[in-house]
Curated annotation (Swiss-Prot):
Residues 73-82 have a biased composition (Acidic residues). InterPro entries: CDV3. Keywords: Phosphoprotein. The modification Phosphoserine is found at S134. Disulfide bonds: none annotated. Residues 37-151, 186-271 are annotated as: Disordered. Residues 48-61 have a biased composition (Low complexity). The keyword Phosphoprotein applies. This is Protein CDV3 homolog. Residues 95-114 have a biased composition (Polar residues).
Length: 271
C-alpha cells in the first residue's frame, strides 16, 4: 500500500508541475488587471528635524536619527517626467553669428582707426574729447567714416556693359509667282540688262490687249459650222418633218439569177 501511495503522490506532483507551466487567457487578464490596480507606494522623504538631523521613515517609530551627512536613500520608484521640447524653428542662429562677428570686427577696426587718428595735444599730453572744438575734430565725421568701413558695406561700382550695335537685316521680298522665260527676258530687256535671246535688244513695253480682236479672243458666234465626216458603214437615219415619215418604196435590188452556162469552156470540154 505504501508503494501505491508513493506512486500516486509522484503522479500528482507531475500533474501539478504541468498545470503550472501553462497559463490560461483568463488568468493572464486577471494578472494584468491586478497589476494596473496596484498603487505605487512611494517611500516617504526623510523629514528634517530640529538641530539639522533627518529622520528616515522606518526609523521614525524607533526614534533613531540619521545625521544629514549620511547619503540619501535612493527611491525605488521614480516618476518619469517628459522634458518639454522647445521650439527653435524661429531662431536665426546664422544671422546672430554674423551680426556678432560683424560687431566685433567693427569695434576692433573703429578702435584701431581711432587710435591712429587721435592727434597729440599741443602741450604734449593725451588727447581729450573736450578739446574737439579747439583742435577742429568732430566725432560725427569719424562715425560717418566708420559706417562705410568694412568689407560687407563696400559699394561695388556696377560694371558698364558695352552695348554692341546689332546690324538690322533688311528682309528681301521675294515674289513666289511663276514668271515665264519670255517675260523674264522682256523684263531684263526693259531694265537694260542683257542675257535675252536677242542679246539685250530693247523691246516695246507691254500694252493692254485688244479685246475686240477675234483672232486673239474668238467667240462662238463667229465660229463656222463644219460638216461632220461620215464614217464608213455608218447607218443612215431618216429625216422627220411635220411629224410624218417618208415611206420609201422598197425596190427589189436583187440581181436575176442566170441559170444558163455563162462560160463556154465547159461546153468545149463536154464535146
Amino acid at each position: 500500500m505504501a508503494e501505491l501511495d508513493d506512486f500516486f503522490a509522484k503522479k500528482d506532483k507531475k500533474k501539478s508541475k504541468n498545470k503550472t507551466k501553462f497559463v490560461t487567457a483568463d488568468e493572464m487578464v486577471k494578472n494584468l488587471e491586478d497589476g494596473t490596480k496596484r498603487e505605487v507606494v512611494k517611500p516617504k522623504k526623510p523629514e528634517v528635524a530640529a538641530g539639522g538631523v533627518a529622520v528616515v521613515g522606518e526609523n521614525e517609530n524607533s526614534g533613531t536619527k540619521v545625521p544629514e551627512s549620511a547619503p540619501p536613500v535612493e527611491e525605488e520608484w521614480k516618476e518619469f517626467e517628459e522634458e518639454q521640447r522647445k521650439d527653435y524653428s524661429g531662431l536665426k542662429i546664422g544671422q546672430l553669428s554674423t551680426i556678432s562677428s560683424a560687431r566685433s570686427r567693427t569695434a576692433q577696426e573703429s578702435s584701431e582707426s581711432q587710435a591712429a587718428r587721435v592727434p597729440s595735444a599741443p602741450d604734449g599730453g593725451n588727447y581729450n574729447e573736450d578739446d574737439e572744438d579747439s583742435n577742429g575734430y568732430d566725432n560725427a565725421d569719424v562715425n560717418k567714416e566708420r559706417v562705410g568701413h568694412g568689407p560687407w558695406k563696400k559699394v561695388v561700382p556696377a560694371e558698364e556693359v558695352m552695348q554692341i550695335p546689332v546690324p538690322v537685316e533688311v528682309e528681301k521680298h521675294s515674289s513666289k509667282t511663276y514668271v515665264s522665260p519670255a517675260l523674264r527676258y522682256s523684263q531684263q530687256a526693259g531694265s537694260g540688262l542683257g542675257g535675252g535671246p536677242t542679246g539685250g535688244a530693247l523691246r516695246p513695253r507691254r500694252a493692254a490687249p485688244d479685246i475686240t480682236n477675234t483672232e486673239f479672243f474668238p467667240t462662238l458666234s463667229a465660229a463656222r459650222p463644219e460638216e461632220q465626216r461620215k464614217k464608213k458603214n455608218e447607218p443612215a437615219f431618216e429625216e422627220v418633218r411635220h411629224g410624218s415619215r417618208f415611206q420609201r418604196v422598197q425596190e427589189s435590188t436583187a440581181a436575176p439569177v442566170a441559170a444558163s452556162n455563162r462560160f463556154q469552156s465547159l461546153d468545149d470540154e463536154a464535146s
